[in-house]
Amino acid sequence: GGTIASQEGEDGLEPKTTGQQMLDLIPELQGLCEIDCVDLLNLDSTNMQPEEWAVMAKAAFEGMKNHDGIVITHGTDTCAYSAAALDTMLTNPKVPVVLTGSQLPAGEADSDAAHNIHDAFLAACGAPEGVYLAFDGRVIHGLWATKIRTMGFDAFVSVNCPYAGKIADGKLMMQETAKEKTVAAATVESAVDVRLDSKVAVFKLIPGFDPVLLETVVDLGYHGVVLEAYGCGGITNYRRNLLPAIEKMIHKGMVVAATTQSTFDGCDLSQYEVGVRALKLGVIPAGDLTTEALVVRTMIALGRWTDKKDIEAFLRGDMSPVDRSVPLTAFIE
């Protein structure tokens, strides 16, 4: 983990605390379950990269063969990327795989580490099979988590998908949708697939964005681009027109996908002319997917397939079980 396992070093906080040292801070875990502790990595999450996603996915897959649940402590800054990666790399995991972290190091007074670790173990013991992030009393499906705070304990929210569950007064309560997903997948064989292509760039559009920036990635050997577009999927096509550069990328065989800069409600390129023209060129709309999830799935799609139809089908969003008439936070409030 990052912050959760950090201690003061020569140049600031750095990961040093072992898994067992963290567990020793939480006597409430005694009697809850039997724990095997593995120090898999000890990295600030800023330094977590696609190679580490593969390490975690393989370790989780091996661990679930003789355990009833998996807990992974992780730095918060890139935890949403790792959660999305594990959710995608692990097909139908047979146990709950639960990531967690903290905003203050485990050894500090008033740290949220013990609370979050305890909640993660409750989820690992009682949640349906799947990948989750447990944080500040909330359980989020792995693909739909995003970090919204740098310091507040309620650092993560579920985006465009109902919360999987909540933990209150030491009790885990799961949404029915999470249980239904498990029943539907019960006959699918469990597997791990860590293939990916990390040559993916992300561009956040801003007023005055220079199309030359998009053209550079073609010559640098990138295979995919994620565009953080405006609103429902607006991509500039006036004055500093981005469409010729996008057309060039697609003609060269690159995958170009679009999401929104807005946190909630997703991307729909079919609503406005500034989205429709990009859609006609072959830009893939990511629907409900967050930027983190889209980046991860683009890398994984490029690693698994060469056929654009397969990649597009994999990247198109709208996969979350969302009832737009019900607030996403209804279950946890």
Mark where each language-model region is:
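Internal gly/pro-rich beta-alpha loop/helix module
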Residues: 99-169
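Accessory alpha-helical/coil subdomains and C-terminal extensions
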Residues: 2, 18-19, 24-29, 141-227, ...
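Short beta-strand segments
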Residues: 72-74, 98-101, 132-137, 204, ...
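Short Gly/Thr/Asp-enriched flexible loops that form oxyanion-binding sites at enzyme active sites
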Residues: 73-95, 237-245, 274
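Short acidic, glycine/serine/threonine-rich loops at helix termini
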Residues: 7-12, 83-84, 109-112, 142-147, ...
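ATP/NTP phosphate-donor binding region
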Residues: 2-62
